[in-house]
Amino acid sequence: MAGTGLLALRTLPGPSWVRGSGPSVLSRLQDAAVVRPGFLSTAEEETLSRELEPELRRRRYEYDHWDAAIHGFRETEKSRWSEASRAILQRVQAAAFGPGQTLLSSVHVLDLEARGYIKPHVDSIKFCGATIAGLSLLSPSVMRLVHTQEPGEWLELLLEPGSLYILRGSARYDFSHEILRDEESFFGERRIPRGRRISVICRSLPEGMGPGESGQPPPAC
C-alpha cells in the first residue's frame, strides 16, 4: 500500500503531505486529518528540543507499552513550560482547537528511538477528547490511518520536522493510526528515512472529565 506510489493525491500546492486510497477518503478526512508543514521555525524546534532533552534523557527507552501499541519509546507528561515554549503551545491551541474546547492541562511528550514505531491503534475516548494536535521534532515520519471497518480506505500523512498534525473526530475514532517503522517508511515511492522522533501532543479534554483530572495517557502519535 505505502510503497506502490500508484496514487499520490495532493491537498496542497507543491510537495504533497497527504495521500490516500481515493478521492472519497480524502474528502471525508479533509478537515479531520490535517498537516501543516513548517508550522515551527528552526529556532522554535530548537527551543522545544532543548527544553525536553534533559527530562527525556533521565528516562530509558521502553519496548513494552501498557497496551502494546508502542515499541522503542520513552514518554512523559509535562505541564510546566518556559515562556517561549508556552507561546508555541498557544499557537497550537489556536490552530487546532475550537473556542469551546478545553485542553488537558498536561502535554504528552513521546520520544521514539530510530528503530521505534507505533502500531495501529484507535485512541480511547477515556483519555482524550475529540481532537489531538502534535508537533513533530527531529526526524520525518509517515503516519498511516486505516479505516477500522473498510481496510481498503486509508490515508497517509508525511510529518516533517517542524510540522503540525491535527486529528479530529472520524480520523481518530473510525480509523486506526500508526507511525511506520524505518524499514516500512515510504510515502508513495519516496523513502522517508526514520531517525529519532519527538512528538509534542496537545489533547482536548475527554467528555465528562474536569480540567484538573488526568488518567493513563493514550498511545498518541
UniProtKB/Swiss-Prot annotation:
Top-level EC class as recorded in UniProt: oxidoreductase
Record organism: Homo sapiens
Protein known as: Alpha-ketoglutarate-dependent dioxygenase alkB homolog 7, mitochondrial
Stretch forming the transit peptide: 1-20
Subcellular location: Mitochondrion matrix
Cross-referenced SUPFAM superfamilies: Clavaminate synthase-like
Chain positions recorded as Fe cation binding sites: H121, D123, H177
Cofactor: Fe(2+)
Tissue specificity: Widely expressed, with highest expression in pancreas, followed by spleen, prostate, ovary and placenta.
Keywords: Dioxygenase, Iron, Metal-binding, Mitochondrion, Necrosis, Oxidoreductase, Transit peptide
Gene3D superfamilies: Alpha-ketoglutarate-dependent dioxygenase AlkB-like (2.60.120.590)
Function: May function as protein hydroxylase; can catalyze auto-hydroxylation at Leu-110 (in vitro), but this activity may be due to the absence of the true substrate. Required to induce programmed necrosis in response to DNA damage caused by cytotoxic alkylating agents. Acts by triggering the collapse of mitochondrial membrane potential and loss of mitochondrial function that leads to energy depletion and cell death. ALKBH7-mediated necrosis is probably required to prevent the accumulation of cells with DNA damage. Does not display DNA demethylase activity. Involved in fatty acid metabolism.
Keyword DNA repair: no
Biological processes annotated in GO: DNA damage response; fatty acid metabolic process; regulation of lipid storage; regulation of mitochondrial membrane permeability involved in programmed necrotic cell death
Stated family: Belongs to the alkB family.
UniProt remark on cofactor binding: Binds 1 Fe(2+) ion per subunit.
Pfam family, one: 2OG-FeII_Oxy_2
Subunit structure as annotated in this protein's UniProt entry: Monomer.
Residue sites binding 2-oxoglutarate per the record: Y165, R197, I198, S199, R203
Result of altering L110Q: Does not affect ability to trigger programmed necrosis
GO molecular-function terms, A-Z: dioxygenase activity; metal ion binding
InterPro entries in UniProt: AlkB-like, AlkB-like_sf, ALKBH7-like
Gene Ontology CC terms, in alphabetical order: mitochondrial matrix; mitochondrion
